[in-house]
Amino acid sequence: MEGILDFSNDLDIALLDQVVSTFYQGSGVQQKQAQEILTKFQDNPDAWQKADQILQFSTNPQSKFIALSILDKLITRKWKLLPNDHRIGIRNFVVGMIISMCQDDEVFKTQKNLINKSDLTLVQILKQEWPQNWPEFIPELIGSSSSSVNVCENNMIVLKLLSEEVFDFSAEQMTQAKALHLKNSMSKEFEQIFKLCFQVLEQGSSSSLIVATLESLLRYLHWIPYRYIYETNILELLSTKFMTSPDTRAITLKCLTEVSNLKIPQDNDLIKRQTVLFFQNTLQQIATSVMPVTADLKATYANANGNDQSFLQDLAMFLTTYLARNRALLESDESLRELLLNAHQYLIQLSKIEERELFKTTLDYWHNLVADLFYEVQRLPATEMSPLIQLSVGSQAISTGSGALNPEYMKRFPLKKHIYEEICSQLRLVIIENMVRPEEVLVVENDEGEIVREFVKESDTIQLYKSEREVLVYLTHLNVIDTEEIMISKLARQIDGSEWSWHNINTLSWAIGSISGTMSEDTEKRFVVTVIKDLLDLTVKKRGKDNKAVVASDIMYVVGQYPRFLKAHWNFLRTVILKLFEFMHETHEGVQDMACDTFIKIVQKCKYHFVIQQPRESEPFIQTIIRDIQKTTADLQPQQVHTFYKACGIIISEERSVAERNRLLSDLMQLPNMAWDTIVEQSTANPTLLLDSETVKIIANIIKTNVAVCTSMGADFYPQLGHIYYNMLQLYRAVSSMISAQVAAEGLIATKTPKVRGLRTIKKEILKLVETYISKARNLDDVVKVLVEPLLNAVLEDYMNNVPDARDAEVLNCMTTVVEKVGHMIPQGVILILQSVFECTLDMINKDFTEYPEHRVEFYKLLKVINEKSFAAFLELPPAAFKLFVDAICWAFKHNNRDVEVNGLQIALDLVKNIERMGNVPFANEFHKNYFFIFVSETFFVLTDSDHKSGFSKQALLLMKLISLVYDNKISVPLYQEAEVPQGTSNQVYLSQYLANMLSNAFPHLTSEQIASFLSALTKQYKDLVVFKGTLRDFLVQIKEVGGDPTDYLFAEDKENALMEQNRLEREKAAKIGGLLKPSELDD
């Protein structure tokens, strides 16, 4: 086998074929050996010189594939280094090989894969050579198409591939300038390409040629100027001749979808007529040759084969694309009304198909339609509404806040919504019956048909629910009466059992919950009362735990969505809360969780109603809740109890009187405090009590209960924290010494034992409680005077002296919060924190990138906050420790954990800015001399490593800052050693030389001209982030390709920021429409 690795002699093709056969068909040791030899063969830099022999003389198609792969590698990486005659030789060889395979009918039929692979290699050459070195390629290709049907068919495939490579996949493989250049070259050749396609479609008889031509045309349609399409009769050909044949129907529909998406002028009547005509023809062909508009597509799809299912998906894409672009064209002509409604009727039928991706396609269109109809209603003149009409509407004004308008009133205006009345009514039903589960619902039916607690949230389902919800909200605004009637009648059929099923009651309840905020208050009151009464009746009526659990989850979801109604109807709110307390004793999995979640959700929106004394009540309801808390929470798990306490904390925070608030807090914490005081007393007398696992669980639970209440009460929690603070820190110390004793007795393995893990839970919860309070505290003087010193004494020395496995990352998190809130008030405290945790933590994480992941993240958060709030602390570090600090920052750059990487880059950026602010002082000068180039080289190291793409924006900012320091003359000392360069060399010149050397050593395949041109662009653009980032991005493409083009510098935009801005604008828009934001998303 090794014979093929001898590159000094001619290649033994037969031996190569044998090795390839062994690799593909053999097994065991021989197969492994063949794989190793083939890998070495392909990796040899001279392998490409053997490719032509393999392609000419090999009898094994797999060997030919390997030869083409070797050529691909050469073309993408080293093409520009080859002499011109070599390049032309390879080019002509590949073209000749493709043509000879096409001219042999037998080969053309049997070796399709090999011909395709050769086509791809040709396209790789084209990306390098065309148009500048091969300007006549497209005319030659078109000229050769008349030589034979096979050549013509393959030319279509090459054109398709070229379009895909240039237009669809160019983002990361080519620089921006190159991609733009190829696109411009392509657009000059449009006419010839289009003429060829048109000629074949008009005259061609070979079915496979027609399909290849349509596939090629498909790739070009979306950027061929529309006049080519509209000045010929190609639309007529597509929408009649090729729609009838089953072979071409699917690809033709895709082509028509592309045409539907073109931007056409609005003022050209001839083009408008053609646009309507091709749509009319297409629907007519579908109705007569494929399926009538009345067909039950849900059933058809379920029994169809793969091709027919794909066709229905393509039909949905065609209809939604065409109608989204050209709906207004059809709406404006009364004679096209039937066509318009038939198209939408097809879409209704397609929407009923049980296939999520297809449903999402139609749903996007429905969103487009109903939002459009809604905004037309919004533009109705408010002045038209006389006071009498306003009363009849059941809402105060036309503004969205007051709920949906009366449909009777809207009939007075010539609105587009009237055209779609029947379609919208059908759509309401489709959406209601296909509603997916909202994220608040925790009780679900699994694949086995059992009712269980749901643990995994699917982001796809959450997004789909959001879209469905928005469509249903618009539909409710368009006809609130129809929506209400459909929902109430479907609910009646749940009660009478005629439509009862878990799926049906769920989707209906989820739909009912999703339209909260769309109705006027009066309508909503009538509607919600009916719904909740019916659902409560169902819980009584239905037997069996599963049935009860399903209905309970639906009641809880619905009531959680209507806080406005609950706020206005105290008796109902009280009934609902008592029902939730009842569900808290229901042990079916998921029900108790959901009861607690719904309780806290309602409390967040209605908290004020619990702290005031309601009419006909003897006390505020929170007092009743606290008095019965033991009974209510008796069957709950600890985590659920914490949620309950957290909800009570939210209510108590709403009490305005400080004395009353403190009394309620004291009452709420009475049970946990009694247990706490008892345990503190007992464990002081008998410390071994803390080794009992039950006691440890109780203590951890008590502290977790405090954390829950503190989370919701924030600064108002101070009296309770004062009650337990000193004993808690004593406990922290006692537990720490116990852990140390266990480690001393049993070695490091002790940290993994249940006993020590239980003790560490106590420590972690204590830290969490203190951190939670300090993060929300307003009384910063008290925090400094009362809390900080005992905390640092209890925590820091223990952390430093512990074995690494017993150190808690929560210490770092807690210290981060202390520095964030009061670091500026305790300079010595910050220095103590740094001295205690910096070196010992760095020593835990500097051996690799994975051990102690939580410590890593928290460590860099702490350094970042100290850098921001208490920078002076770093200046107190001795030089050796400061060097470790810089090393730690550069170490963070190299992490794959995004938090660590981005924090590291931010620390570096803040540090450089802090040093700059110090001005021309010895410390700053020393810093620049010692560390400036470390930061430059380490930033370039991660910038050019594709594993660190996610840090690109921050890397660019840091590099910009470093370059600006030099080019704006902010550094007043030479950055080089005297012997390195001639005296008097400026920092600018030295930086350019340094970067040029560094980059040419790292990327020897780049020419000095490329590097000089990159650096020249970079050092001119350091004031404009967008341009600067574009230059860096282009450089990153260039380093992957040998012999790139030195003129390749343009810029690229950042998508992430655009997305954030889009989300912000969408939220602003949604806030103006009743019901578009969920109740939980609204500000109180």
UniProtKB/Swiss-Prot annotation:
Cellular localisation: Nucleus; Cytoplasm, Perinuclear region
Binding partners and assembly: Interacts with GSP1/GSP2, polyadenylate-binding protein PAB1 and PRP40.
Residues modified to Phosphoserine: S1080
InterPro entries: ARM-like, ARM-type_fold, CRM1_repeat, Exp1_repeat_2, Exportin-1/Importin-b-like, Importin-beta_N, XPO1/5, XPO1_C_dom
SUPFAM superfamilies noted in UniProt: ARM repeat
GO molecular function, one term: U6 snRNA binding
Gene (UniProt): CRM1
Database matches in Pfam families: CRM1_C, CRM1_repeat, CRM1_repeat_2, CRM1_repeat_3, IBN_N, Xpo1
Record-level GO cellular component terms: cytoplasm; kinetochore; nucleus; perinuclear region of cytoplasm; spindle pole body
Protein name: Exportin-1
Keyword Protein transport: yes
Lineage: Eukaryota, Fungi, Dikarya, Ascomycota, Saccharomycotina
Domain of life of the organism encoding this protein: Eukaryota
Role: Receptor for the leucine-rich nuclear export signal (NES).
Family in the record: Belongs to the exportin family.
Keyword Metal-binding: no
PANTHER family tied to this protein: EXPORTIN 1/5, EXPORTIN-1
